[in-house]
Amino acid sequence: MEKIDALTKTLLYEKAAVIHAAFEDAPTTVAFVEVEKNLSVDAKLEKAFVKTNSINDAWWNNEGVTKMFAGGACRSTSMGDMVLIGNTKYKCDI
């Protein structure tokens, strides 16, 4: 059953890479966020942004988020950071 679940997940979801660049010396990928393939680009970006912001808990504990940073903590995604969906990189500006 695990193979079927993995295949279904691959068909329905894609990973958005969240790249922190606003306050860093060099852009750094801090997370991969699972987003539904059928969502609009704006909805995928919104989901990646929300899921990498700490609200009630540390954002890296959110479901569908894969932590990619070293260490015990990482700031939330902010204006000036980027999200990569497919081959297109989007800058957080609102």
Cite the ranges covered by each PLM segment:
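N-terminal disorder-to-order initiation segments that are Gly/Lys/Arg-biased
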Residues: 1-41
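A conserved acidic, glycine/proline-rich C-terminal tail/linker
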Residues: 60-73, 78
